[in-house]
Amino acid sequence: PMVGCVIVKSGKIIGEGYHKRYGGKHAEVNAINNVKDKSELKGSSFYINLEPCSHHGKTPPCSDEIIKLKPKEVIISNQDQNPIVNGRGIKKLRNNGISVIENIKKKKGLDVNKRFFKNQLTGLPYIILKWAETEDGFLAKEDGSSKWISNELSRMLVHKWRSEEPGILIGVNTANIDNPSLNVRSWKGNNPIRIVLDPNQKLNNNTNLLSDKGTLMVYNKKAEKKLNNKIFIKN
């Protein structure tokens, strides 16, 4: 999940940090390391958008690190819905005499980590369904001659969405008819992994998806192979 931490003492920010990458130091540890005078940590206030973890994973429990420093309080937006945390970090802090204030900017926190919460609560990925249609409910002309329904601003929004998601999925007919690249062009950010459902291997050999350098995963019923960053998965 995306987590940030700000440490405040006497009305001033003394440290801040965020979780930069999976398996890396958590936001709380990075914020603590950012504090120049560690003596100021005692009696301070920790502002965190997600409950500090309470278990040993790729890193030690953040709740234990906080307890050692004896802050006055910890203010959080959301409880961590991961079953191995799920309130245990909050309980551990309170059992060690640290005040915990919950649900500050709760809705904002839920929005920031909506992908994480969706997965933890349902076991399913967070999915955005995207299409463009005319006011009277049509997607394209029957002969396929139509082009853009969306405008420049809406297309820019789509590229923003692409930069925020790890993957984008289409069917083989869309790939062959529209010949999309499915990369990020009208926005700054990383390209998503492109995924095509092609059960009978009908994907055109000259499609942009096969000719560029981006990662492509093609799910089909016949072949299992890998050609550089083009992965064909039999399923």
Segment roles from a protein language model:
Residues 2-11, 131-132:
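Short beta-strand scaffold segments in enzyme catalytic cores
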Residues 7, 12-108, 193:
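Zn2+-dependent cytidine deaminase-like catalytic core
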Residues 10-17, 108-121, 198, 203-205:
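A short, flexible N-terminal coil/short beta segment enriched in small residues
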Residues 23-24, 90, 104-132:
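Proteins enriched for Cys/Gly/acidic motifs involved in redox and nucleic-acid/cofactor modification
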Residues 30, 34, 92, 111, ...:
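Alpha-helical scaffold segments in soluble metabolic enzymes
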Residues 83-84, 110, 204, 225:
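Generic structural signal for helix capping and beta-alpha/helix-loop junctions
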Residues 85, 108-112, 153-156, 177:
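Short, conserved clusters of charged catalytic residues that mark active-site
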Residues 118-119, 124-235:
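Active-site ligand-binding patch in enzyme domains
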